[in-house]
């Protein structure tokens, strides 16, 4: 008999005391193992009964865990019906895409006339000067390494109307004046009337011509250095124009603060600065990118950025409305001077401003620091400016409320059907236990269970629960067990049906009365939620039966003690049987030896 398998049921470590293989019947010819197993099988019936009971309790615990999960899911929905926002749903429809709206459960219904006076804006600090001023025209091409490392090479100027082109060699030692002169000569050679110029105030090259043309790097990176590779050819008044999209001194954010200081002949010292009173570490070896990241990751409440097209640093508050941005360089690092923001323009953020009227005559001014403005339980979301008066229609969302209540009824029926199934389902008897799935094993384990019967009956009793208020019973909402004929059967099963037309009518009359029925102090959902909570909470009714320290667990511990005792008893019995059969085998062996000796003696006597 396999006692180790039974021991594993209660997580008991079992070691046979027999040791090694037992071989019997060598002398007697008996199948000793089978005989002992048969004896143990007969004597172990009480152990089998205890084990089956233990395993059933284990399945009951699993089944109750599933029941608890189902009731938790049901309670989650029931709890939401205590909230006014669940039952009293309202919708808001705007006449403009520039203003959307959301209506809460307490929103005043009606048509809102809305004027957008001002959107909320962010405080912006913009540097008064470029970070690196444009170089004068005597700078050589090789020195213009603000964003890219200059590479001398060949640039080709195409006359797109004739297909002719002229190539210009750009050398590292060429000054900007030299390059402009070469390009002007190339225009003439390509049959184009026009001019090339460099503006020292903007750091940009401009080309004008009477013919369609293009400029392409064959080797080197002249057009990239002067930001001509991003430029578009414009046509106006019979002339074409082509201008750099950014100053040649526009910076790569990979440049260190020390490198930037070299361009501007300014000084940068490692230390600390304060933005909005928050200290930020500054190291002269910080890159522009890493410095910006430090600022943005700090608690200063601002977002810094560098726009290489404008060649300026901009700092913007993270929250809209009239927020302050303050700069302090108390350690004398020279950072703000280096970045061109020591002198700056400060554009203070504005509050959002709406004018709202319910009658189109009397207007209320409503302000908000953000573009989300609340009024009368309605939140208006501004996404742009318009001079038009916008209408927002706020009304009860009857369909949404009806669908939510139908969802509740569906969940109720699903829960009651599940409980009823667990109470009435039969165990599977046409399969061996080894062939069954866990789900099949659990079938029938809660049939007629006392606690489950109580839960089912209590929930079914809520169908006739009387709530306080203008609506007292479910049937007044059109929720009942059905018409005569089906009503009794549904009542026994705890099954509900919805008269959708009646429910819709009640909701349209006054959705707040519907919510009061569900979510009032003694409302249907309030009382139902309280009962469900008593069932599913830690150490609640279900845990007291099937929890860690519940009745089933205590029963299992008691059974495990009995099972362990029986295993020990049968183990000793098995040893005893093997010992007795071994003695028997030895006696038979001796008798056979004596018989053989007598036979040999008699045979010897007869031969004399």
UniProtKB/Swiss-Prot annotation:
GO biological process: bacterial-type flagellum-dependent cell motility; cell adhesion
GO cellular component, as recorded: bacterial-type flagellum filament cap; bacterial-type flagellum hook; extracellular region
Gene3D superfamilies, A to Z: 3.30.70.2120
Pfam families referenced in this protein's UniProt entry, alphabetically: Flagellin_IN, FliD_C, FliD_N
Keywords: Bacterial flagellum, Coiled coil, Secreted
Compartments it resides in: Secreted; Bacterial flagellum
InterPro entries named among the record's database cross-references: Flagellin_hook_IN_motif, FliD, FliD_C, FliD_N
Recorded superkingdom: Bacteria
Major subcellular site: secreted
Coiled-coil residue windows: 47-75
Similarity-based family: Belongs to the FliD family.
Record text on subunit structure and interactions: Homopentamer.
Protein's job: Required for the morphogenesis and for the elongation of the flagellar filament by facilitating polymerization of the flagellin monomers at the tip of growing filament. Forms a capping structure, which prevents flagellin subunits (transported through the central channel of the flagellum) from leaking out without polymerization at the distal end.
The name this protein goes by in its record: Flagellar hook-associated protein 2
Annotated source species: Thermotoga maritima (strain ATCC 43589 / DSM 3109 / JCM 10099 / NBRC 100826 / MSB8)
Lineage of the species this protein comes from: Bacteria, Thermotogati, Thermotogota, Thermotogae, Thermotogales
Encoding gene per record: fliD
